[in-house]
Amino acid sequence: MPKRTLQGVVVSDKQAKTIVVRVDRRFTHPIYKKTIRRSKNYHAHDENNQFKPGDMVWIEESKPISKLKRWTVVRGEPKKTA
């Protein structure tokens, strides 16, 4: 079975070798048919501490690394500045 991959935005990088990624998802409510947005935070392993808040990253599930980390960063794009 292939590993799941999620796309999200870095929210925090205050921990060593760890980033917090917010992943947004959209779905239609089954009764009211309204589009709803929900988000969830994932702790991901960032070996080189290269990602900063605002960066777009792709994370992939992995074996447990610590109590909260079950995801690793696959690739990322720097934050777009105006």
From Swiss-Prot:
Give the gene that encodes this protein: rpsQ
Q: Which GO terms describe its molecular function?
A: rRNA binding; structural constituent of ribosome
InterPro entries, A to Z: NA-bd_OB-fold (IPR012340), Ribosomal_uS17 (IPR000266), Ribosomal_uS17_bact/chlr (IPR019984), Ribosomal_uS17_CS (IPR019979)
GO biological process entries: translation
Task: Describe its partners and assembly state.
Answer: Part of the 30S ribosomal subunit.
Cellular component GO terms held in the UniProt record: cytosolic small ribosomal subunit
Classification via NCBIfam families: PRK05610.1, uS17_bact
Q: Which Pfam families match?
A: Ribosomal_S17
What's the protein here called?
A: Small ribosomal subunit protein uS17
PROSITE patterns assigned to the protein according to its UniProt record, in alphabetical order: RIBOSOMAL_S17 (PS00056)
The similarity annotation says:
Belongs to the universal ribosomal protein uS17 family.
Q: Please give the function described in this protein's UniProt entry.
A: One of the primary rRNA binding proteins, it binds specifically to the 5'-end of 16S ribosomal RNA.
- Per UniProt, which keywords does this protein have? Ribonucleoprotein, Ribosomal protein, RNA-binding, rRNA-binding
